[in-house]
Amino acid sequence: GDFITAEIAAGRTVNVNLKNLAVGYKNSSFDNGVMIHEYGHGISNRLTSQGYSCLTNLEQMGEGWSDFFSLMLTNTPGYTATTARGIGTYSTNTATTAGGIRQYRYTTDMSVNPHTYADTNTTGGQPHAVGEIWATMLWDLHWKMAEKYGYNYDITANANSGSAKTLQLVT
């Protein structure tokens, strides 16, 4: 901090590199899902009025919305309701079929992701755990809407698809 500030004040060029040589380290900025997740926080903070503290308490929904945005904006052709999807798999140096940074992968298959609303009673108010449950419910909603109105991995291609309608409802 002080050294860099002094160098800048002296008019010298400062090059800063962030490195972590730990085994398995991957730069999270190359993980589309993580980047969209973080951008999702910006969306939910912008759309939620100030003064309610619903995005800063232990029962916040922001983590779930952010995971949901990540899932929606990284869909690909061929995904189905039972395709199991992780969050942060690149960053954790795990296979795309792994859970990544969440306890369970997102899917409507209850044998893979057994989360239900009742699980919020046992999270201890941990925001990521509550968010994972909320995102699971939103993901289930997406696939029910896709079942009724059609799935489209490109949400901009058809505003009447269940995928686009779900994203519109959530935002």
What are these regions (language model features)?
Residues 1-171:
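Extracellular protease catalytic domains of secreted zymogens
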